[in-house]
């Protein structure tokens, strides 16, 4: 039984978002649909989810004392992390004191960095992964690369959106790759993972929901990456029945091992019928924004339903759909969007995130489209995204 109070009343059900970006904004909107009181927290003011929250706070979420202070002040019933850069030791302490961390503090801590989740998947669960080594100094980084071999990929153990990642083909790139990885970590310089390159036909995100009525799967989401970040995603990604079964088995093992209720974005490589585990996020995934147009319940609605203790039931997928990011490059604290009217139409939508500024390249929106097939949906989404003119 799920009892929900009314926002801004004494019996309100309160949800605190740790991270208030575009994904958190959609989670906040889904909470608002249920009359839930939303508190958005991020490291900078006027973040997207703050626009649709009842209250907001700006703190360094890696500061355990600051995190504990804001949680103690607001007394949320649910703490919902949206990003990795959080003082997860503090979350585990607070969970031990009776607070509800979504999906659970252990999942948040293990997936905060690539080392925790890779060791869980490969060493504890025995799932197929790429070859890998970890390094915490430039000397051990060279040793790790020698063990893995060329070509390989280096990533900070804690980063997002491709920051700090390099594709290494030769020893001449090592010094630059190490320096770039040290600059790109979400918590500053530190450990890196060196991964062998996996031969694959395509990558998928398998949006997996762990809820009171069991584990549920959305149709697989295919996506194209560039510079470590996604550019387009589509659903459903066609794959063999055997590969889909194996993908679902891997995802089920991972989410049950992590524990808790919520939606998980399980990233996998697919080569023929073979499936290799890559990463997992214990929260909605950026490639899953396609579900805003492709499903009866988006990944954000599914996440909220699951952590509130509601059953999920059958997830309806409407048919071929795609998303394409709006990714301008400029510097401005007063961004405007022109020609939006030319982007939208029948079966085509645009979401603008409301980020307060841009300095360089930044994802400021996404175009969503349906089509007769996935290829058509991708073309329509890309065309819509290209028609939006971003000005400073």
Swiss-Prot record:
What sort of enzyme, by top EC class, is this? ligase
Going by the UniProt record, its keywords in alphabetical order are:
ATP-binding, Ligase, Magnesium, Metal-binding, Nucleotide-binding, Purine biosynthesis
Where along the chain is N(1)-(5-phospho-beta-D-ribosyl)glycinamide bound? 22-23, 82, 286, 355, 362-363
Which sequence ranges are marked TM in the entry? none
Task: Pinpoint the ATP-grasp domain residues.
Answer: 119-308
One biological process GO term for this chain?
A: 'de novo' IMP biosynthetic process
Q: Which residues bind ATP?
A: 114, 155, 160-165, 195-198, 203
Does the keyword section mention tRNA-binding?
no
SUPFAM superfamilies from the UniProt entry: Glutathione synthetase ATP-binding domain-like, PreATP-grasp domain, Rudiment single hybrid motif
Which pathway does it serve?
A: Purine metabolism; IMP biosynthesis via de novo pathway; N(2)-formyl-N(1)-(5-phospho-D-ribosyl)glycinamide from N(1)-(5-phospho-D-ribosyl)glycinamide (formate route): step 1/1
Q: Which residues bind Mg(2+)?
A: 267, 279
GO terms (molecular function) for this protein are:
ATP binding; magnesium ion binding; phosphoribosylglycinamide formyltransferase 2 activity; phosphoribosylglycinamide formyltransferase activity
Could you state one GO cellular component term attached to this entry? cytosol
Q: Which domain of life is it from?
A: Bacteria
Q: Which InterPro entries match?
A: ATP-grasp, ATP-grasp_carboxylate-amine, ATP_grasp_subdomain_1, PreATP-grasp_dom_sf, PurT, PurT/PurK_preATP-grasp, PurT_C, Rudment_hybrid_motif
Q: What is its EC number?
A: 6.3.1.21
Subunit composition? Homodimer.
Q: Record's family? A: Belongs to the PurK/PurT family.
Q: Which PANTHER family match?
A: FORMATE-DEPENDENT PHOSPHORIBOSYLGLYCINAMIDE FORMYLTRANSFERASE
What is the protein's known function? Involved in the de novo purine biosynthesis. Catalyzes the transfer of formate to 5-phospho-ribosyl-glycinamide (GAR), producing 5-phospho-ribosyl-N-formylglycinamide (FGAR). Formate is provided by PurU via hydrolysis of 10-formyl-tetrahydrofolate.
| Name recorded for this polypeptide | Formate-dependent phosphoribosylglycinamide formyltransferase
- What is the name of the gene encoding this protein? purT
